[in-house]
């Protein structure tokens, strides 16, 4: 091991290898914390090495100190899986073994990659490269033999918190630039691209990944290179280029789950919904497999993407079914928990139904489980926040309990708690504004009015809403800030079942321009108030029949609610106004549903001729 200031991780690492290795060798490069004190509890084989900005030099120094027949290399932020059996792995007596490294990511995610970490103690095996150091196993002079071990190494160094703490990205960039300058081979240029990708500098990443491609040939990292190149292009919204690469790559590597998953994400981001759905389903068939695979690409992540896709199509029941599968497979995945409550709310299920279903699939067995749950519910301002705080008798900050009371409709208790605070936290100012509207409380409004930085016109809008002025001016001009706040409040009022206040708020939004009116209709559709939305959309459509967003939204509402004759008219008009892929796919789905197979085939042929990256129409 090579260490420096690793007191937070080192004990876990060393405890994981007890009784599994014969000796522990630690190379310290200048620790100033309690690292060496902890290490001394496990071994006396501690050596100092002056750091020279070269991981290979430090690694080679460390393996020179080993006396055993085989060497296992770990970092301080890694630890062996409890079921690992190193002796079983080396029974075949090969020169080196590729072990799976499971890298923990933030929010409960993970990805797995293979690396040579177990190898024979031979003077001919040595490390190369300053940063992404690796053994010289590809060496025609020695003809080393290798295989795959079953040992799993867990790595925690890629969580957001750890990356920020260690400032790894900056360190990696400086070391890699020096390495690439001296030795611009496939491996180094590939890792340079990866490092820029981690730093979010996608254009630079693409330059190096493209340089690495012709040098890589049959290198084991070629599938990962292609995935990362396509991903970076996608991040820059160069979807055509990204799909060209990933679609060709899938032909060469048809069983690589990670590649399929990236392909599905790109299809989804491009708006190729049918291909996205089929690709994520293919990922589920495969499961997690491949040399480098993000955990869940063939499982919970694919289900999560399907849940997003079905939600986007307003197929809320299918979205809910998919998100349930996410939580069943990975309860620690925080975005899945958040999405569950968002989707369940749109199903118009009662709070008790939402709670019972959740507890059926989410086992609350640890303190961390309830902490994660409370964080999600607070972020959503969900009515169940107060339920779980009370059920588990959790002590939380006063602003959290005030929010919990407010969104469980205990308005007067919430007001008392807000008024007891000397300062309203910035994150809760809109909560207090909403409560002031609900309770028609101008005094409470005054607590946050100044801090919200409203101008006089904006202040007047909220005063009108609090006072429920029925004859408010019809020429009110809403700023973007006010529009966004009111749209957000409209969802909250529906969830709280404050329909009279929702109506007052809607009256103000309907005095604005078309954009907030359309957004209001989208909110109504999301919460299944379809007929109300249609009643608002029709006069909008009559006044602005060529508004593409309006035609699309009204067409989708009619299609999803089986008003198919109206859908035919609207989707064909949409095709005239915006003859792009999304319009064509909508028309195809409509013709299939009404049984007009001839028209459906014509649309399919048109898609095939124009959109070469679309797979379902080929």
Q: What residue ranges belong to the model's regions?
A:
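Short, well-formed alpha-helical segments that are part of the catalytic scaffolds
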Residues: 1-23
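Acidic helix N-cap motif at the loop->helix transition within catalytic regions
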Residues: 8-11, 33-42, 83-84
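A conserved acidic beta->alpha catalytic loop
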Residues: 16, 28-37, 51, 75
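Conserved donor nucleotide-binding strand/loop of the catalytic core
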Residues: 37-57, 61, 65
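Catalytic-site signature of metal-activated, phosphate-bearing donor transferases
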Residues: 57-63, 80-204
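Short aromatic/hydrophobic "clamp" motif used to bind/position activated sugar donors
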Residues: 71
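Residue at a conserved register position within TPR or TPR-like alpha-solenoid repeats
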Residues: 196, 233, 267, 310, ...
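Alpha-helical repeat scaffolds
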Residues: 207-211, 241-249, 277-282, 316-325, ...
């Amino acid at each position: 091991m090579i260490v420096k200031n690793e007191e937070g991780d080192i004990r876990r690492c060393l405890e994981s290898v007890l009784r599994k290795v014969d000796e522990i060798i630690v190379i310290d490069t200048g620790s100033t914390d309690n690292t060496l004190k902890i290490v001394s509890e496990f071994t006396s084989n501690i050596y100092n090495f002056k750091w020279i900005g070269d991981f290979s030099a430090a690694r080679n120094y460390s393996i020179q100190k080993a006396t055993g027949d085989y060497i296992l290399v770990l970092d301080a932020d890694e630890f062996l899986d409890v079921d690992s059996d190193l002796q079983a792995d080396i029974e075949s007596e090969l020169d080196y073994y590729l072990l799976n490294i499971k890298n923990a990511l933030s929010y409960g995610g993970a990805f797995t990659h293979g690396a040579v970490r177990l190898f024979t103690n031979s003077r001919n095996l040595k490390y190369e490269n300053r940063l992404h150091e690796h053994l010289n196993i590809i060496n025609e002079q020695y003809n080393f033999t290798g295989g795959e071990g079953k040992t799993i190494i867990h790595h925690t160094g890629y969580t957001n918190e750890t990356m920020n703490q260690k400032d790894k990205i900056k360190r990696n960039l400086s070391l890699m630039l020096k390495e690439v300058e001296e030795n611009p081979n496939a491996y180094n240029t590939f890792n340079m691209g990866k490092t820029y990708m981690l730093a979010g500098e996608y254009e630079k990443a693409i330059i190096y990944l493209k340089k690495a491609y012709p040098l890589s040939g049959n290198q084991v990292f070629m599938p990962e290179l292609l995935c990362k190149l396509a991903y970076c292009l996608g991040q820059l919204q160069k979807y055509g280029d990204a799909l060209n690469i990933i679609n060709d790559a899938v032909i060469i590597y048809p069983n690589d789950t990670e590649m399929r998953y990236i392909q599905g994400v790109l299809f989804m981001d491009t708006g190729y919904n049918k291909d996205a759905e089929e690709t994520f389903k293919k990922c589920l068939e495969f499961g997690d497999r491949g040399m480098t695979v993000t955990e869940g690409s063939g499982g919970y992540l694919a289900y999560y993407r399907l849940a997003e896709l079905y939600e986007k199509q307003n197929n809320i029941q299918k979205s809910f079914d998919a998100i349930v599968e996410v939580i069943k497979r990975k309860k620690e995945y925080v975005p899945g928990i958040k999405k569950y409550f968002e989707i369940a709310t749109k199903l118009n299920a009662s709070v008790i139904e939402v709670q019972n279903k959740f507890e059926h699939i989410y086992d609350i067995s640890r303190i961390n489980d309830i902490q994660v749950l409370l964080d999600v519910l607070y972020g959503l301002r969900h009515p169940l926040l107060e339920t779980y705080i009370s059920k588990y008798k959790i002590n939380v900050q006063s602003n959290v309990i005030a929010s919990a009371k407010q969104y469980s409709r205990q308005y007067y208790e919430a007001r008392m708690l807000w008024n007891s605070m000397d300062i309203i936290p910035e994150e809760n100012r809109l909560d207090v504004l909403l409560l002031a509207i609900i309770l028609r409380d101008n005094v409470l409004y005054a607590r946050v009015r100044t801090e919200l930085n409203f101008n006089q016109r904006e202040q007047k809008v909220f005063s009108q809403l609090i006072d429920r002025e029925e004859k408010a001016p019809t020429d009110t001009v809403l700023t973007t800030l006010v529009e966004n706040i009111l749209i957000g409040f409209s969802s909250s009022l529906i969830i709280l079942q404050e329909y009279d206040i929702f109506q007052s708020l809607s009256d103000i939004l309907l005095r604005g321009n078309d954009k907030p009116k359309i957004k209001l209709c989208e909110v109504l559709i999301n919460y299944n108030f379809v007929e109300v939305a249609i009643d608002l959309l029709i006069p909008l459509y009559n006044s602005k029949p060529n508004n593409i967003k309006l035609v699309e939204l009204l067409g989708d509402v009619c299609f999803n609610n089986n008003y198919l004759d109206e859908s035919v008219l609207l989707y064909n008009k949409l095709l005239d106004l915006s003859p792009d892929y999304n319009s064509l796919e909508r028309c195809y789905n409509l013709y299939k549903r009404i049984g007009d197979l001839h028209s459906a085939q014509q649309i399919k042929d048109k898609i095939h001729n124009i959109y070469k990256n679309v797979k379902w129409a080929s």
